[in-house]
Amino acid sequence: MNVAVIGAQWGDEGKGKIVDYLAGEAAAIVRFAGGANAGHTIVANGKQYALHLVPSGILYPEKKVYLGSGMVIDPEALFNELESLKANGVQWEGRVFISERAHIVLPRYREEDKKRDSERVHPIGTTGRGIGCAYSMKSERDGIRIADLEWQEKRTEWTKEDRAFLDRYSDRLCAMKVNMTCEMYRLKNEKVLLEGAQGAMLDLDSGTYPYVSSGMSCAAGACVGAGIGPRAIDRILGVFKAYSTRVGNGPLPTEFDEQSQSELYRYVRDTGREYGVTTGRARRCGYLDLVALRYACRVNSITELALTHLDIYDTLDTIEACTAYNIDGTITEDFPASIEKLEKAKPVLQSFAGWKTPLKACQNYKTLPPHARSYIEYIEQYCGVKVSIVSVGYERQDTFMRNDPFDGKR
């Protein structure tokens, strides 16, 4: 059974934690898109791990993890990450595999990424990791794939600098390469997690273009990255926070006003640790955007949701969420494609009573305070999708499941 896990907002929703939580019952975990621009923070057994390329299931010693076909991989960043894991007691040898169709990020791509963004009229706010350039080279048919490394004839097409860089990693990368379609066929009777990067609202086609990532962060990307067809995806789990965040430029219709709502902004940012794992940049924060969340559910055929960071609201008297946009006097519940409309959108807010109780002590859904359950049930009713998993803290155990995505029940 294959369960895809995607971000249902603008990234940083807590996908890594949810994948880590579910990975215990999976045979394998496949990261299907993105590169070292992504960042997952996982807290397990009192230790904090920051992952950028390696799938979140790596912390389970018996699990196999795969870097899928839709990824763009910086070999230097990958092996630095693997060495860091090893230094922290995580034995990864023989458990990490790379799709032979994955593309490689070269050092010169990083500077090219920064240069391109600086020349834009409206800069995107790239991480400068070379990801956009790698995907651009891929679409122009000029990229280098893992499969190319074993062919000496290919080397004549590369620059001297590229050859020198790749020579340092070729043998190790080739030893880890696999045919993803064959691997997934062998795993057809097993439970497999397909792990996304960034979020649905950053997808190149269905996100807030042009302020998007270059890869496929939508559910469809799971098929491409894992080397399987759409019918092979059994469940799609969308992860979202109890509020909205975004890194870099682009519209965030429910963003807190840093002047009139500075206290609320600082509280959410600091209590929620809303600083980028990859860049360290403070994330922009705002109310939960139900218009965007419902759109993400529909465009990705999300079958269930996982709610994270619910505990960040523990001390608030009142909680608000956006249920519609006011765009030049017109009220709409539909998420527009136009960036111009999104930048004009003012949130129409619905108020909810706060629960004023620490949620970390809650062991299951029934023990949540009534006001917390009401907040969740309103989200379910608005989006038309059930919340199957709730996270009330950073540790693995601060998570409880109402319905297991792997049981196949709708």
State what each model feature region is.
Residues 1-410:
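Non-transmembrane, aqueous-exposed alpha-helical and coiled segments at domain scale
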